Amino acid sequence: MTIAVPSFNQGRFLDDALTSIFQQEIPVEVFVMDGGSSDNSVDVIRKWGHRLCGWRSHADEGQAAAINEAISQGLAPYVCWLNSDDWFLPSGLRKLLDELTIYPDAPAVYGRSWNVVQYSGKRTPVWVEPFHERRLALRCIISQPATLIRRSAWEAVGGVDGALHMAMDYDLWWRLYRQCGPLKFLDDFVAVNREHEATKTKTLRRRHYQEAMSVVRKHHGSVPLKWWLAQPYAVWFKSRFG
């Protein structure tokens, strides 16, 4: 499978991400797209250079563009991306791949993931649910690092939308569903989402809600009341308690 690893100034986490990829029990082609980091990221990338199918480090047009660039360079029939501050659990990719093999009509599969707070180590399960349009309209029920997509479906929808910066994954799930059919849910933990002080959904919470609501409106036709009620509370809670 083809794995894109977009990264920018995440050298302290990047080694964990790459280690988790190469510990998987399946053949992978990995492309690291670094946005011109000023930390130790390039040193980490060079450490893994002999295992990578490609990498670069220079200013780019953002995360979505980097993901599309990486996946376009690969040839494998399955694709995914792993943000450099997240990681896969042992055998996680194998479980996802097996599920797509069993269900050949599914454009993508997603499993469960943990959310780990960096400073405290607190671990909680990410809210994930079996796929249904109504559930997807109420919230993003899919955890991005716990997903695997058929390349044919990825190419059919044109990859991630480069105009989006906060909800590009949420938008992708909608487009895969609309154009290729329901995504398959795997009831097993396969990945970990790391929450830290620089996480975009933490530092840009209001913008994240606004972008996600625009995605719902675009693909579902209306924004459920739950979004309007949850937005101010979530912004306040994050600003107050972190």
Identify the function of each model-found stretch:
Residues 19-28:
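Short, acidic, metal-binding catalytic loop of nucleotide-sugar glycosyltransferases
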Residues 91-123:
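Conserved donor NDP-sugar-binding/catalytic core segment of glycosyltransferases
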Residues 40, 65, 86-99:
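Acidic donor-binding/catalytic loop of UDP-sugar-dependent glycosyltransferases
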Residues 20, 34-43, 83:
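A conserved acidic beta->alpha catalytic loop
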Residues 79:
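Short aromatic/hydrophobic "clamp" motif used to bind/position activated sugar donors
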Residues 128-211, 215:
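Conserved nucleotide-sugar donor-binding catalytic segment
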Residues 58-74:
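Glycine-rich, basic loop-to-helix element that forms the pyrophosphate-binding segment
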Residues 27-36, 56-59:
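Short beta-strand/loop segment that forms part of the nucleotide-sugar
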